[in-house]
Regions:
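S-adenosyl-L-methionine
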Residues: 1-86, 123-158
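Active-site segment flanking the S-adenosylmethionine/decSAM binding pocket
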Residues: 146-186
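Conserved SAM/SAH-binding beta-strand->alpha-helix loop
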Residues: 119
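Glycine-rich SAM-binding Motif I of class I
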Residues: 99-103
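Conserved class I S-adenosyl-L-methionine
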Residues: 89-97
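C-terminal substrate-binding/active-site "lid" region of AdoMet-derived donor-dependent transferases
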Residues: 172-230
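Short beta-strand element of Class I
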Residues: 111-116
Length: 232
């Protein structure tokens, strides 16, 4: 962690105190600490944001993406605990970045955990992070498969059931992804769950026929969960 990172953290917490008060700022500090401690505990690199202009690669839809952002492990864990999954479910992180969510998802009863990442640099970091956890029995890393590919070039195998998005795309890309998912439902009708964190365009999923089945708020983060079927 750089000195600049901790300076920015200090200013962020001071701003939060002025805006939210002591109690919520202490909760926010815990989440920030959880963010950093996760990396230190498992010897990985996943806690710092990376803007697209810092990544050295060319891709048609690069301008339609957003920066790699981090989310506290507690938040991810809580969301996955609240949503009902089956042991046959296949989890896909569309824009998996450094692979943090993949590691946490591997602890749950998913049949497979797949990450799609278009940046070669982030893909390599994610692979290294997974590799550093191979001997750690806290995660089931053999379930994880990371694919370095533009998400619009990824061919859905018509069996994926749980899609995770941490606000990774513009509205244009999100529309095309929803169309691809709906197209796969024609070939293999099944229950789909979409976990949308920091949702900028939830109306797109609603317009595409997905129903919001859950909402989870945690101070400065929101998560909407959608499905093509209403769970009982």
């Amino acid at each position: 962690m750089s000195l600049q990172y901790f300076r920015e953290l200090f200013h962020y917490l001071r701003f939060s105190y002025n805006k939210r008060g002591l109690y919520l700022t202490l909760k926010l500090f815990y989440l920030k600490f959880d963010n950093i401690f996760f990396d230190l505990r498992y010897g990985i690199d996943s806690s710092q944001n990376v803007s697209l202009d810092k990544l050295n690669f060319q891709i048609t839809n690069k301008t339609e993406g957003v920066e790699y952002g981090t989310i506290a492990p507690y938040f991810i864990q809580k969301i996955l605990e609240l949503v009902k999954f089956d042991t046959s479910d296949i989890f896909v992180d569309l824009g998996c970045g450094k692979g943090r969510v993949l590691l946490i998802a591997s602890k749950f009863n998913f049949k497979k955990v797949i990450g799609i990442e278009f940046s070669p640099e982030l893909y390599l970091i994610a692979q290294n992070n997974i590799g550093n956890c191979l001997s750690n029995n806290h995660f089931i890393t053999e379930k994880i498969n990371i694919i370095q590919k533009d998400v619009l070039e990824y061919v859905f195998n018509h069996h994926e059931t749980v899609f995770y998005l941490y606000n990774p795309f513009s509205n244009k890309i999100l529309i095309m992804i929803c169309d691809q998912i709906k197209g796969s439902l024609i070939i293999n009708p099944r229950r789909i769950i979409i976990i949308y964190v920091n949702p900028r365009f939830p109306e797109i999923l609603i317009d595409k026929g997905f129903k919001q089945i859950m909402k989870y708020d945690l101070i400065n983060k929101k998560c909407f969960v959608f499905s093509n079927q209403v769970q009982n």
